[in-house]
Design a protein with these regions (language model features):
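Terminal interaction modules at protein C-ends
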Residues: 2, 33-63, 232
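Bacterial N-terminal signal peptides that target proteins for export
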Residues: 4-21
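N-terminal signal peptide c-region/cleavage motif recognized by signal peptidases
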Residues: 29-30
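Active-site beta->alpha N-cap acidic-glycine motif
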Residues: 58-128
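Structural preference for beta-strand elements that scaffold enzyme active sites
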Residues: 64-66, 88-92, 113-115, 159-162, ...
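Substrate-binding cleft of extracellular glycoside hydrolase catalytic domains
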Residues: 106-157
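Catalytic domains of cell-wall/extracellular-matrix polysaccharide-remodeling enzymes
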Residues: 138-232, 240, 250-271, 277
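Short, flexible loop segments at boundaries between secondary-structure elements
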Residues: 276-283
Length: 283
């Protein structure tokens, strides 16, 4: 295995800076990128931004990786297959999923952290629907807060929230401020799934001082086993460079099998933790 170059800089705060870093990683593990309307993945493409200058380096603590599995709650058997991996995943459940309550209980019993996968308006709406009871830019702040509170009430075990779709809403400061204000009142964290460039979530989270993280790597936008394996390697390299990283996958059998295959590598090279161990409150 080629080792990670020692000159990689401190973790970029901006999406543009992270895109440049990912471009460097692609020299070692280049995946095929694809968008899709089901999960609304923002492709991890490079841009022309300059490489960020080096900053604070992390100590000898093992790099931490959180792996979030989105869209949990529809296929109970497949969710159980992920639980059988016996690694500290984080399940993000859709609020309207038919098996959400049972799977949330099973996951909690297995030590798997629970998040709410909150449907938000994509740029393609209404041609592409984020699902029932989604947060939409046409709604008032009070209406969005009501829908968010209702969704949270359906999953009392949740520790945090990430967005399902949301490429339109996550670019709008006022709606995101209202959403994150509700999370602050409930002592919940937020992970931006990063389904668009120019998301305002990090800036609003910093203003509100709520625990926050960005998604670094989508594991399965390309469902070929070799492509998923490359994305897992990218996740490991990102964590080794910056001390921690967040990966998001989806409930596919091929994703589960790839994680099983990568389990020894993950356990040896990084510390797998729930998402709550990754999120930080920006100073």
């Amino acid at each position: 295995m080629i080792s990670l170059p020692s000159f990689f800089p401190a973790r970029p705060a901006s999406l543009a800076g992270r895109a440049v870093f990912l471009a460097l990683l692609l020299a070692f593990a280049a995946p095929a990128f694809a968008d899709g309307p089901v999960h609304e993945l923002y492709p991890e493409a490079p841009d022309a931004s300059p490489l960020p200058s080096a900053g604070r380096r992390l100590g000898r603590r093992a790099p931490r990786v959180a792996i979030i599995i989105d869209d949990i709650g529809f296929d109970a058997a497949l969710a159980e297959a992920f639980l059988s991996l016996e690694i500290p995943l984080t399940f993000s459940l859709l609020p309207h999923a038919p098996h959400r309550l049972d799977l949330a209980r099973r996951a909690a019993d297995a030590g798997v952290e629970i998040m709410l996968h909150l449907p938000m308006e994509p740029l393609e709406y209404p041609r592409v629907s984020p699902g029932p009871e989604a947060l939409l830019s046409s709604q008032s702040g009070d209406r969005m807060a009501e829908r968010l509170s209702a969704a949270l009430s359906r999953l009392p075990q949740v520790r945090g929230v990430n967005n399902h779709m949301g490429s339109r809403l996550t670019g709008l400061p006022a709606p995101i401020h209202r959403v994150l204000s509700v999370l602050r009142e409930r002592d919940l964290y937020f992970v931006d799934s990063v389904t668009r460039p120019g998301s305002v979530c990090r800036a609003v989270a910093r203003r509100l001082q709520i625990p926050f993280a960005d998604r670094d790597v989508f594991l399965d936008h390309d469902l070929r086993p070799a492509a998923i394996d490359r994305q897992i390697e990218m996740l490991i390299r990102t964590a080794r460079a910056y001390g921690q990283a967040v990966g998001i996958g989806h409930p596919h059998a091929v994703t589960r099998d790839a994680l099983e295959k990568a389990r020894p590598r993950l356990m040896e090279q990084v510390q797998l933790v729930p998402a709550s161990r990754i999120v930080q409150t920006a100073g």
